[in-house]
Regions:
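N-terminal Rossmann-like NAD(P) cofactor-binding subdomain of oxidoreductases
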Residues: 11-13, 21, 88, 122
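Glycine-rich phosphate-binding loop and adjoining beta1-alpha1-beta2 segment
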Residues: 13-60
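Glycine-rich phosphate/adenylate-binding loop
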Residues: 6, 88-227
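Structural motif
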Residues: 82-83, 117
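Conserved S-adenosyl-L-methionine
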Residues: 2-17
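A structured beta-alpha segment of the ubiquitous adenosine-cofactor-binding alpha/beta core
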Residues: 43-81, 88-95
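Conserved RecA-like P-loop NTPase ATPase core
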Residues: 24, 85, 196
Length: 227
């Protein structure tokens, strides 16, 4: 996201302001799979990463060492954004977030507090998906003679009937070897790159032809989801 922000600024875009929410701390199991070092152990993940990105790129992004509000009554104006990105292994948090986003009244698209898009990342050990959906029922698109525009994209909760899924908490991993049994080494970073590429196309070109993808890292196959 920091590279995306830097590239956008380089082509005249005002850039991004990002707030990261995470209540977890860095453990030994995170070293190697993610960009954490042994000196980061014990630090809050959000604060650690945002501080590093701010120092490296000169940004003023915000870190919140807590979970995202679980209900609209607990959310403040600064909890809302035009694009919400989730990378969670918890089904309930997805459902809670969707209930919040769809309950926020759409005032105007130019307000940074109006939820417009929700991008969700999910994965198993070596497979995963990225889905970019629209929060409002419709987002008005400009008239085009070249393309057939689409005003609505399905969010992840409309793809998957999470209410029917029985969630089992796998618990925290105590070592890198144990963590790799649950998530392969490059599945998270590969999905992150591909998801950011969708956002890059959207910002850079003002349009996207694919709003998601399915990835199988063991077979090196990827299936894009066309608009």
């Amino acid at each position: 996201m920091a590279r995306l922000d830097t590239a956008l600024r380089g082509v005249g875009h005002p850039g991004l302001f990002i707030t990261v929410y995470d209540s977890d701390i860095v453990t030994e199991a995170n070293i190697g799979r993610q960009l954490f070092s042994p000196s980061d152990i014990g630090l809050n993940k959000a604060q650690c990463l945002v501080t590093r990105m701010n120092n490296f790129f000169g940004n003023d992004w915000k870190a919140v060492p807590d979970i995202y509000p679980a209900a609209l009554k607990d959310a403040r104006r600064d909890n809302l954004a035009n694009i919400t990105i989730t990378c969670t292994d918890n089904i309930k948090s997805r459902l809670d977030l969707w209930n919040i986003l769809k309950a926020v009244p759409v005032s105007e698209y130019r307000s940074h507090e109006t939820p417009l898009y929700w991008m969700d990342f999910g994965n198993t050990q070596d497979t995963g998906q990225v889905i970019l959906g629209t929060v409002p029922k419709k987002i008005k698109q400009p008239a085009s003679k070249l393309y057939e525009t689409v005003e609505s994209l399905k969010v992840i909760t409309r793809y998957v009937k999470y209410a029917r899924v029985k969630e089992k908490d796998s618990g925290p991993s105590c070592s890198l070897a144990e963590a790799l049994e649950k998530q392969d080494l490059f599945i998270n970073s590969t999905l992150a790159q591909l998801g950011c590429n969708i956002l890059w196309k959207m910002f850079r070109n003002g349009m996207i032809e694919h709003y998601g993808l399915y990835l199988n890292l063991s077979t090196l196959k990827m299936n894009p989801i066309p608009v």
